[in-house]
A protein has these predicted regions:
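Bacterial N-terminal signal peptides that target proteins for export
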Residues: 1-9
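C-terminal segment of classical bacterial N-terminal signal peptides
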Residues: 14-22
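Generic low-complexity segments that are intrinsically disordered, proline-rich and/or Lys/Arg-biased
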Residues: 4, 21, 26-27
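N-terminal capping/small domains of soluble enzymes
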Residues: 40, 44-103
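Terminal low-complexity, poorly structured segments
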Residues: 9-10, 228
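Active-site loop segments of alpha/beta catalytic cores
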Residues: 25-56, 79, 83, 106-347
Length: 347
């Protein structure tokens, strides 16, 4: 209860304070869609640095979830509305590889509770900011299907063909979600890709059974969406190096959200990544770093380092979702700082 009261107070306070004047705030709010589109034009640098961070809310679906998204968007001054995906496919008793054949294609109706959240947020903010719902990967839905405590890699290897059919059905299910969300106000999508890190699946199964259906999600999003972010997820399973990351360069997307550190001890060069992908990079900060655990001043110093080494057309954010307890006031301070960074630093 205290946390809820604190966040309510924080929303009220943050709505009346900030780095910019009220007039400037209104100008930014009315042009967030335009400012994101300007970043996509890599023929010229942009003085304004868009920024956004994400965290999961206590309320997952329904009116309270809509309100949580509204409060967070307003309080942090972020540049687009990212809608969390909080619906799970039913668990199926997968005891052997053959049981993957039980996985169906889920219809648009299955995703209706999630789409309702998108529709409400689009009604509220669609004219001022892009509405970008999260899209989980087919592999993530496969994990939901078997539930906790089961070895997905082992079950996939028992019957790769049946597993591949399940992944296909889950990818087609996600396509149904995408098309429904687009009809109800989504401008595009934040598409998560998983499985290509070389850890969660064997390279053979990834290449032969999963990759085309993982990529299919991005292809559908690209077909129907105005703007899309590809999130190359390494949650719990880091990629070996940057070259492994660049294997996703053929995925269609407007913007790329990237991991920062690799299992061989190396780190990502943001300018090189933007050049290799040929699209703006979104990220730069570690989700469990200073943005979660440091002070506002420490976080600003980290932003300095990121933006000094990033390409001119860049969107500041984290490499994945930040912890739910992350201070909203700190996120607001960092976002406001990024917005004006190139002007205040003459870069």
């Amino acid at each position: 209860m205290k946390q809820i009261i604190f966040k309510t107070i924080a929303v009220a306070l943050l709505a009346t304070t900030g780095y910019q004047t009220v007039a400037a705030q209104q100008q930014v709010a009315n042009n967030r869609r335009e400012r994101i589109l300007q970043v996509l034009d890599q023929s010229r640098p942009n003085a304004y640095v868009p920024a956004a961070f994400f965290l999961h809310f206590e309320n997952k679906l329904g009116r309270k979830a809509v309100q949580d998204h509204k409060d967070f968007y307003r309080a942090t001054n972020m540049d687009f509305v990212k809608v969390f995906y909080e619906i799970s496919v039913p668990q199926i008793d997968i005891k052997s590889g053959k049981d993957w054949e039980k996985v169906p294609v889920y219809s648009e109706e299955f995703f209706a509770p999630q789409v309702a959240v998108i529709e409400d947020l689009a009604r509220e903010f669609g004219k001022e900011a892009f509405i970008l719902p999260t899209v989980y990967s087919p592999l993530a839905l496969a994990h939901q299907t078997i539930g906790r405590g089961k070895d997905l890699r082992k079950l996939a290897e028992e019957n790769p063909v049946a597993f591949g059919k399940a992944i296909k059905n889950l990818s087609l299910s996600i396509e149904n979600y995408l098309r429904s969300a687009r009809k109800h106000g989504a401008d595009g999508f934040y598409v998560s890709s998983q499985g290509g890190d070389g850890n969660s699946l064997s390279t053979k199964i990834w290449q032969e059974q999963v990759r085309q259906w993982d990529k299919h999600v991005s292809e559908v999003a690209n077909e129907i969406g105005e703007i899309n972010i590809l999130h190359i997820c390494d949650y719990g399973t880091p990629f070996k190096n940057a070259e492994a990351l660049y294997a996703f360069a053929d995925y269609p997307a407007s913007i790329i959200n990237v991991p920062l550190n690799f299992s061989d001890g190396s780190s990502l060069n943001l300018k090189e990544a933007q050049q290799r992908f040929g699209r703006p990079i979104f990220g730069g900060l570690e989700r469990l770093g200073v943005i979660a655990n440091g002070t506002i001043e420490e976080a600003k110093k980290a932003v300095d380092k990121v933006l000094e080494n990033a390409a001119p057309n860049f969107i500041l954010g984290a490499d994945c979702t930040v912890p739910g307890e992350t201070d909203w006031e700190k996120l607001r301070a960092v976002i406001d700082y990024a917005h004006n960074w190139r002007l205040t630093h003459n870069k």
